[in-house]
Amino acid sequence: VIGGDECNINESPFLAFLYSQLLSSRRYFCGMTLINQEWVLTAAHCNLYPDRKDMNWWLLIKLGKHSGSTRRWVANYDEQVRYWPKEKFIWWYCPNKKKDVINNYVWVWWDKDILLWELWMLIRLNRPVKYSEHIAPLSLPSSPPSAKWWHVGSVCRIMGWGQITETWWNSEDTLPDVPRCANINLFNYEVCRAYNQRWWRGLPAKTLCAGDLEGIIRGGWDTCVGDSGGPLICDGQYQGIAYWGSKPCAEPDEPAAYSKVFDHLDWSQSVIAGGTWWRGDDTCP
């Protein structure tokens, strides 16, 4: 998190992180949110080794941890580790009706304003976690976030163990010892399109747009590399999943994008309940 402060040790008992034993110094690479004893929610692009099940045993999900760096490793008494999931479900592409190419990336469209791509991933842990002082779920939202045209909407909280300097994936020295937290503001989707039409025209209208009001002009608080998959908490509710931002981070005129949790509640609840679920190779909802 760029421009943030150290999170209070009791602020984020729902925050987990994905850790790989094969990435050398880059061992931590994505945030996650615990939503009940068996399930965590993260960004779909955190699905490392998607076609190599034999590699999954090198991936760990750590919960209840506050000090996450190898330089200052201070364990909480109630930390828990889970190996790669029992199941994972990705909210994926729709069969394409139209393709558009932006900066050599193929965007697949379902209708005139909804772009469906890999946005988020539900992971079922290999065994349930036990709730404790530093491990507790973050409830799914009961209402959508608010944002007004050209005005500051909800005040939202971001957090994670991602980079604390603006450079794009630097050394481990730019990763914090403990998670960083910052307050940012939610903006109307059209406001973000006005600031950065190159990228925001390719993102679905249901995407949440958030950043620092002054930073929109001169750069400021922002998520960065390693914060992907972490939560966006607005008015105390879990409203977004970090999945896209500027490179370098915290650039002027480039607010970050978050997948909107509220708009996918039915899908998430269906998956957790063991019901039907949708992938890109099935009929679109």
Curated annotation (Swiss-Prot):
<feature type="disulfide bond">
    <location>
        <begin position="224"/>
        <end position="249"/>
    </location>
</feature>
<feature type="active site" description="Charge relay system">
    <location>
        <position position="45"/>
    </location>
</feature>
<dbReference type="GO" id="GO:0044478">
    <property type="term" value="P:venom-mediated platelet aggregation"/>
</dbReference>
<keyword id="KW-0378">Hydrolase</keyword>
<dbReference type="InterPro" id="IPR018114">
    <property type="entry name" value="TRYPSIN_HIS"/>
</dbReference>
<dbReference type="GO" id="GO:0005576">
    <property type="term" value="C:extracellular region"/>
</dbReference>
<keyword id="KW-0800">Toxin</keyword>
<feature type="active site" description="Charge relay system">
    <location>
        <position position="113"/>
    </location>
</feature>
<dbReference type="InterPro" id="IPR033116">
    <property type="entry name" value="TRYPSIN_SER"/>
</dbReference>
<dbReference type="Pfam" id="PF00089">
    <property type="entry name" value="Trypsin"/>
</dbReference>
<dbReference type="GO" id="GO:0004252">
    <property type="term" value="F:serine-type endopeptidase activity"/>
</dbReference>
<dbReference type="GO" id="GO:0044485">
    <property type="term" value="P:venom-mediated fibrinogenolysis in another organism"/>
</dbReference>
<comment type="similarity">
    <text>Belongs to the peptidase S1 family. Snake venom subfamily.</text>
</comment>
<keyword id="KW-0645">Protease</keyword>
<keyword id="KW-1202">Platelet aggregation activating toxin</keyword>
<comment type="subunit">
    <text>Monomer.</text>
</comment>
<keyword id="KW-1204">Blood coagulation cascade activating toxin</keyword>
<dbReference type="InterPro" id="IPR001314">
    <property type="entry name" value="Peptidase_S1A"/>
</dbReference>
<dbReference type="InterPro" id="IPR043504">
    <property type="entry name" value="Peptidase_S1_PA_chymotrypsin"/>
</dbReference>
<keyword id="KW-1015">Disulfide bond</keyword>
<feature type="disulfide bond">
    <location>
        <begin position="30"/>
        <end position="46"/>
    </location>
</feature>
<dbReference type="GO" id="GO:0006508">
    <property type="term" value="P:proteolysis"/>
</dbReference>
<keyword id="KW-0720">Serine protease</keyword>
<feature type="disulfide bond">
    <location>
        <begin position="192"/>
        <end position="209"/>
    </location>
</feature>
<dbReference type="GO" id="GO:0090729">
    <property type="term" value="F:toxin activity"/>
</dbReference>
<protein>
    <recommendedName>
        <fullName>Thrombin-like enzyme TLBm</fullName>
        <ecNumber>3.4.21.-</ecNumber>
    </recommendedName>
</protein>
<keyword id="KW-0964">Secreted</keyword>
<feature type="disulfide bond">
    <location>
        <begin position="156"/>
        <end position="234"/>
    </location>
</feature>
<dbReference type="InterPro" id="IPR001254">
    <property type="entry name" value="Trypsin_dom"/>
</dbReference>
<comment type="function">
    <text>Thrombin-like enzyme that induces the formation of fibrin clot. Cleaves the Aalpha-chain of fibrinogen (FGA) with higher activity than the Bbeta-chain (FGB). Induces platelet aggregation in both platelet-rich plasma and in washed platelet preparations. This aggregation is strongly inhibited by preincubation of the enzyme with PMSF.</text>
</comment>
<feature type="active site" description="Charge relay system">
    <location>
        <position position="228"/>
    </location>
</feature>
<feature type="domain" description="Peptidase S1">
    <location>
        <begin position="1"/>
        <end position="273"/>
    </location>
</feature>
<feature type="disulfide bond">
    <location>
        <begin position="94"/>
        <end position="284"/>
    </location>
</feature>
<dbReference type="GO" id="GO:0030141">
    <property type="term" value="C:secretory granule"/>
</dbReference>
<feature type="disulfide bond">
    <location>
        <begin position="7"/>
        <end position="181"/>
    </location>
</feature>
<dbReference type="InterPro" id="IPR009003">
    <property type="entry name" value="Peptidase_S1_PA"/>
</dbReference>
<keyword id="KW-1199">Hemostasis impairing toxin</keyword>
